[in-house]
């Protein structure tokens, strides 16, 4: 019985440590989200027309990445300390879209990135079917 209670104590304390780390990470991400909001405002209102559209689109996608990571952490606490797979897939899709927007020089690379998005969308569809859905 002593081993079982010790294991539970270790698991509970590691869970607390993980929770504190995720709360600190969420706070850092909120700071970056605010900084990105300020950056988007500067790009929107203070930049010249030629470069501002690309910078604005890239900034918006980065903004969504921060937003999705924060939403993932919130969902972790709401779902009883569980990371839903579909949020990681959303983050992956958004990150690849950002990569396509930023680096679209090589058409073969862009095609490979697009294929990766297709694989992630199919994975998202499969993860949301009734057999695999946990939520």
From Swiss-Prot:
Transport is among the record's keywords: no
Protein's GO biological process: cellular response to phosphate starvation
Keywords annotated in UniProt: Cell inner membrane, Cell membrane, Membrane, Transmembrane, Transmembrane helix
Pfam families assigned to the protein according to its UniProt record, in alphabetical order: PsiE
Record localization: Cell inner membrane
Membrane topology: Multi-pass membrane protein
Transmembrane region(s): 20-40, 54-74, 82-102, 107-127
Family of the protein in this entry: Belongs to the PsiE family.
Name the UniProt record assigns to this protein: Protein PsiE homolog
Species name: Yersinia pestis
Classification of source organism: Bacteria, Pseudomonadati, Pseudomonadota, Gammaproteobacteria, Enterobacterales
């Amino acid at each position: 019985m002593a081993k079982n209670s010790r294991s539970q104590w270790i698991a509970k304390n590691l869970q607390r440590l993980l929770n504190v780390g995720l709360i600190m990470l969420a706070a850092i991400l909120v700071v970056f989200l605010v900084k990105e909001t300020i950056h988007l405002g500067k790009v929107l209102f203070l930049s010249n027309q030629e470069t501002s559209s690309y910078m604005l689109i890239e900034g918006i996608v980065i903004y969504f990445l921060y937003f999705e990571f924060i939403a993932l952490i919130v969902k972790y606490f709401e779902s009883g300390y569980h990371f839903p797979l579909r949020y990681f897939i959303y983050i992956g899709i958004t990150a690849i879209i950002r990569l396509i927007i930023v680096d679209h020089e090589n058409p073969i690379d862009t095609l490979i990135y697009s294929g990766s998005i297709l694989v992630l969308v199919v994975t998202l569809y499969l993860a949301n079917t009734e057999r695999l859905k946990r939520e």
